[in-house]
Swiss-Prot record:
InterPro entries with a match to the protein in the record: LpoA, Peripla_BP_I, TPR-like_helical_dom_sf
Single biological process term from Gene Ontology: peptidoglycan biosynthetic process
Transmembrane stretches, start-end: none
Keyword terms, alphabetized: Cell outer membrane, Cell shape, Lipoprotein, Membrane, Palmitate, Peptidoglycan synthesis, Signal
Source organism: Edwardsiella piscicida
Lineage, top ranks: Bacteria, Pseudomonadati, Pseudomonadota, Gammaproteobacteria, Enterobacterales
Name under which the protein is recorded: Penicillin-binding protein activator LpoA
Lipidation positions, renumbered (S-diacylglycerol cysteine): C27
Protein encoded by which gene: lpoA
Length: 692
């Protein structure tokens, strides 16, 4: 109860002391209108507001407003001003201000793309002394400082961040981001991780990743494993809020292949391609490719082909069809003249493909279904929208095709409920939930070569390419993939006709490994997000390759590489440590021992069917395709189109899902562009052996 003590005025009136105190407080409140600075809370106002408050504040709170202004400047992308203001902070700061100074310093270093400096600052911060809002920023800074490289510190930051998020949408996004980071780890990475005994949440995440990697090739087993995991780890946030990628798997429904519309050009120059694709597709549908056995060693004949190939080794290949890529058709990577029949490497068994752990990938055999209804539609006779409408009305559940690039480009503007496996790829791929793209092209092979050469530790490649549109396309594809892997600029050197190459030989100069950088459009820079603030990254010029060339990727026919390889040796020596790589365009299976000895050390790629993965299936192919490299590749593409159609839902919804096909180990990227990992072979002492 308030005291009844009063003050008597001259007029005799009584004024309560409480009222007097209230009036005094009101008067004193007019002295300063600056509110206290919430330095440990969120900074949601503009930098101008905080700077104004800083100017009007007393010495006690001025540093608080200064720190808030720095955060606002970072949010607004004004890095120089933020750095200047950070440098103007007084040397005498309170403990709370010192913590905020270190945290905002780390955020500034991240915005400057100096992650190592940011990490050094963050490791000195005591998280327990931070407010909840500061802890949220701290863990987001740890994640951003990882620069997309998955580390234990980054994963722990995601886990610690989860309970600090208040909105369902934020929690879901963080779980998806946690899973995306974990998904980049290989089984070898997992086996090398050491965690603390009390890290139950982290252990649950790692176990979830293991069961995903072990079972993703079988959706039914994966579904059962996920449900069992949810029972074993009920306290893990992902147990009740699964990552979107895994939740999609639980609700996965396989695409029906009971009725398929096959869209191909049945007239004109591309008809020969279509015939080979359709033949391979029907062969797989009827079970020819589901009867294959494990790869076996093949005894070598005198000319390097396996004895199991019978008379194929002696058969000559007719001239391949013209490259009509300019007209929009698929462009198989094959030599155009003097090619021999396919053959397996000799002196060694053809190796099965391996996963990231080094274990063999089981073939993803799609059993034949002779009763499946296949309706072929001619894209050269009617517009694509009309054909898709007809296919839908006829009850098609899935479309395979179109083949020509101009038709594939139209898919971006069409709306159809049908699932589509396009047999080519547009220049600019757009992500459509019902479309996947499967292309067999020199560009696709060049991207695989970039990944292979990078994996072998090479960092300064040179491309030796023909002076033609083909060479330009291959160079762009290789360089784009190379830079996406983290490499610098790629050099290119072009050559002309065989006559030009012979004149170079006559000059005795050889081929020196120099060139000009491949020009490609720069990728959009990634932005940096810290505490919900997105800071655009500046455009960075490509990193120049340092040092001498350590790898050469050659796009040449057998006749051309016969001239090129000796000229490289002439100018650079044969024991120079430079890796030589060639595309399937140069593979001459029927070449004699002289050619194989001349190519000593050269690595080259080709599709598994032509690299000897299953000679029995090769024997079953129609003769007109067995004896022509380019058509045989398209025949294999048709067979893989059947397999991919049967795994359409898995490719769209299970990241990392792989299919072992006749054209390579097939997987899909985020836009469902089918990527091929090819087997690599090497000429060694007159034999052809798998690259270990």
């Amino acid at each position: 109860m308030l005291s009844s003590i009063t003050v008597r005025t001259k007029s005799g009136r009584l004024i309560p002391l409480v009222l007097a105190a209230t009036l005094l407080a009101a008067c004193s409140g007019r002295v300063s209108t600056t509110p206290p600075a919430p330095v440990q809370s969120e900074a949601t106002a503009s930098a101008d507001y905080y700077l104004q408050q800083m100017q009007q504040s007393s010495d006690d709170s001025k540093a608080d407003w200064q720190l808030l202004a720095i955060r606002a400047l970072l949010r607004e992308g004004k890095l120089p001003q933020a750095a200047d203001l950070l440098g103007q902070l007084p040397s005498q700061l309170s403990e709370a201000q010192q913590l905020e100074q270190r945290l905002v310093s780390a955020e500034l270093e991240i915005a400057r793309h100096a992650p190592q400096q940011a990490q050094a600052i963050l490791t000195k911060l005591d998280v327990a002394q931070l407010s909840q809002a500061q802890q949220l920023r701290y863990y987001q800074a740890v994640i951003a400082a990882a620069q997309g490289k998955t580390t234990l510190a980054q994963i722990r930051a995601y886990i610690a961040l989860q309970p600090l998020l208040t909105q369902e949408k934020q929690r879901k996004a963080n779980i998806d981001a946690t899973w995306a980071a974990l998904s980049t780890l290989t089984p070898a990475d997992l086996n090398g991780m050491v965690i603390n005994a009390n890290e139950d949440i982290l252990r649950g995440w790692l176990d979830l990743l293991r069961l995903y990697q072990d079972n993703r090739q079988d959706p039914a087993l994966l579904k059962a494993a996920i449900k069992d995991w949810q029972t074993r780890y009920p306290n893990n946030p992902a147990a009740t809020l699964l990552p979107s990628a895994l939740d999609n798997i639980l609700h996965l429904q396989s695409a029906s292949t009971a009725s398929i519309a096959l869209l191909l050009p049945l007239n004109g120059q591309a008809k020969v391609f279509s015939d080979a694709i359709e033949a391979g597709f029907n062969a797989a549908k009827n079970g020819a490719f589901s009867q294959n056995s494990a790869p076996t060693a093949a005894a070598a004949t005198d000319n390097g082909a396996p004895a199991s190939s019978g008379t194929l080794a002696a058969a000559t290949t007719p001239s391949a069809p013209a490259d009509v890529n300019a007209a929009g058709a698929v462009s198989p990577s094959a030599q155009g003249t003097d090619a021999a029949a396919p053959a397996a490497p000799n002196d060694s068994a053809a190796l099965p493909p391996l996963d990231a752990a080094g274990d063999p990938i089981a073939p993803s055999v799609s059993p034949g279904n002779p009763d499946a209804h296949i309706q072929v539609y001619d894209t050269s006779s009617q517009p694509l929208p009309a054909l898709l409408s007809q296919a839908q009305q006829a009850g098609a559940s899935l479309v395979v095709g179109p083949l020509l690039k101009n038709n594939v480009d139209q898919l971006n503007t069409l709306s159809t409920p049908l699932n589509i496996l396009a047999l080519n790829q547009p220049e600019q791929v757009q992500n459509h939930p019902n479309i996947c793209y499967f292309a067999l092209s020199p560009e696709d092979e060049a991207r695989d070569a970039a990944r292979h050469i990078w994996a072998q530790g090479k960092r300064t490649p040179l491309l030796l390419i023909p002076r033609s549109p083909l060479g330009d396309r291959v160079a762009k594809a290789f360089a784009t993939e190379w830079q996406s892997l983290g490499g610098g600029s790629v050099l290119q050197q072009t050559f002309g006709s065989s006559a030009e190459l012979r004149s170079t030989i006559n000059g005795g100069t050889g081929i020196r490994l120099t060139g000009q950088p491949v020009s490609i459009a720069p990728a959009q820079p990634a932005s940096v997000t810290i505490a919900g603030l997105t800071i655009p990254a500046p455009v960075q010029p490509p990193v120049a390759s340092g040092g001498g060339v350590d790898a050469v990727y050659i796009i040449a026919t057998p006749a051309e590489i016969t001239l090129i390889k000796p000229m490289i040796d002439l100018a650079n020596g044969t024991h120079n440590g430079i890796g030589l790589y060639a595309s399937s365009r140069s593979y001459q299976a029927g070449a004699g021992p002289d050619f194989r000895l001349e190519m000593e050390g050269v690595q080259f790629s080709d599709i598994p069917l032509l690299a000897g993965s299953d000679p029995a299936i090769l024997q079953q192919a129609p003769a007109q395709y067995r004896n022509d490299y380019s058509l045989m590749r398209l025949y294999a593409m048709g067979a893989d189109a059947w397999t991919l159609a049967n795994h359409f839902a898995q490719l769209r919804q299970i990241p990392g899902f792989q299919v072992q096909g006749a054209t390579g180990t097939l997987s899909a990227n985020d836009n469902c562009v089918i990527q091929r990992k090819l087997p690599w072979l090497q000429y060694q002492k007159g034999s052809i052996v798998p690259v270990q």
